[in-house]
């Protein structure tokens, strides 16, 4: 029997920092639980591998290249993953099972738009409609 895999891809951004009261042993236990959970979901075809992000970075704009990281420390993006799910709600429910949630991290789940960008189609990058 062929199992039907979810058809939409979602980007998950890991945000925040570990709770300050946690010991290194508690943090490592959460990390180990995460990798076991993540590995199982990759094996099931429900997640794809992602990566942690380094602390340093650059913001590139038309005015300048600025050293980073950016934003408040609680808002820093620490890593990313890809979730495969049938809906945004299903992807969010899957991330609600992430073992590191209980330790202070949070996750932003965003659909990946398969369409090519266009100046004539409203998106998060196009300016508001002109009157």
Locations of the language-model features?
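Conserved, structured core segments of small domains
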Residues: 1-131
């Amino acid at each position: 029997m062929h199992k039907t895999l979810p058809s939409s891809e979602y980007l998950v951004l890991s945000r925040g920092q570990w709770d300050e009261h946690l010991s290194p042993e508690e943090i490592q236990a959460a990390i180990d639980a995460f990798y076991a959970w993540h590995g199982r979901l990759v094996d099931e075809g429900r997640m794809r591998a992602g990566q942690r992000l380094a602390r340093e970075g650059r913001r590139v704009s038309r005015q300048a290249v600025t050293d980073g990281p950016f934003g408040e420390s609680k808002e820093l993006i620490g890593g990313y993953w890809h979730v495969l799910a049938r809906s945004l709600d299903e992807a969010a429910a899957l991330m609600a099972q992430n073992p590191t949630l209980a330790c202070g991290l949070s996750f932003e789940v965003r659909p990946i738009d398969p369409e090519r960008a266009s100046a004539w189609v409203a998106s998060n990058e196009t300016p508001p409609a002109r009157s």
